[in-house]
């Protein structure tokens, strides 16, 4: 039985949740997001709270209810506060610049890399070695951050590469003669 599904999702002021069949739409100041409820999950709306429950008592239904609750909570938080992810570029000559919806990366290759941001994600570069990604959609934000990091993931000897700001790189010692 999922303990996550038992906790209600609190809906702050300024956020509206509408349900049309299995489609749930969440609107707020940062945008509009939607997702499809699983057939084994039911959604009940009470004043300022959303309660998810399984449609029938089974292990799979409780698992789906817990997942739906976590996704719905991320949607509510995303349209009200938004999410952000910081990336750091560590290495000589590694730098980034944002031009509109394109992030231009110089990561030690013979050519610069132009990464086109998907709709719903914005980027800014306070310094040449730092990228801040912002979005209302947590899943999309994580996907974009992972794709940018994959161009030059951190290596364990010098720690050079693109890393998350809160990431700890396990360092290896160089071979001794």
From Swiss-Prot:
Q: Per the similarity annotation, which family is this?
A: Belongs to the universal ribosomal protein uL6 family.
Q: What is this protein called?
A: Large ribosomal subunit protein uL6
What is this protein's function per UniProt? This protein binds to the 23S rRNA, and is important in its secondary structure. It is located near the subunit interface in the base of the L7/L12 stalk, and near the tRNA binding site of the peptidyltransferase center.
GO CC aspect terms: cytosolic large ribosomal subunit
Q: Which UniProt keywords apply?
A: Ribonucleoprotein, Ribosomal protein, RNA-binding, rRNA-binding
Q: How does it assemble?
A: Part of the 50S ribosomal subunit.
Name the source organism. Acinetobacter baumannii (strain AB0057)
GO biological process terms, alphabetically, are:
cytoplasmic translation
Q: Which NCBIfam families match?
A: L6_bact
Q: Which Gene3D superfamilies match?
A: Ribosomal protein L6, alpha-beta domain
Any GO molecular function? rRNA binding
């Amino acid at each position: 039985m999922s303990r996550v599904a038992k906790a209600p999702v609190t809906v702050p002021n300024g956020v509206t949740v509408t349900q049309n069949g299995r489609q749930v739409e969440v609107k707020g100041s940062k945008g509009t997001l939607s997702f499809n409820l699983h057939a084994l999950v039911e959604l009940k709306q009470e004043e300022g709270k959303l309660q998810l429950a399984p449609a029938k008592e089974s292990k799979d239904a409780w698992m789906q209810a817990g997942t739906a609750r976590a996704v719905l909570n991320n949607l509510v938080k995303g349209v009200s506060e938004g999410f952000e992810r910081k990336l750091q570029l560590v290495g000589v000559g590694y730098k980034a610049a944002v031009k509109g919806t394109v992030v231009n990366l110089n990561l030690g290759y013979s050519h610069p890399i132009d990464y086109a941001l998907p709709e719903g994600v914005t980027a800014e570069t306070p310094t040449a070695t730092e990228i801040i990604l912002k979005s209302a959609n947590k899943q999309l934000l994580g996907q974009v951050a992972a794709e940018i990091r994959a161009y030059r993931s951190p290596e364990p000897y010098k720690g050079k590469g693109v890393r998350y700001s809160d990431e700890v790189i396990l360092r290896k010692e160089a071979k001794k003669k």
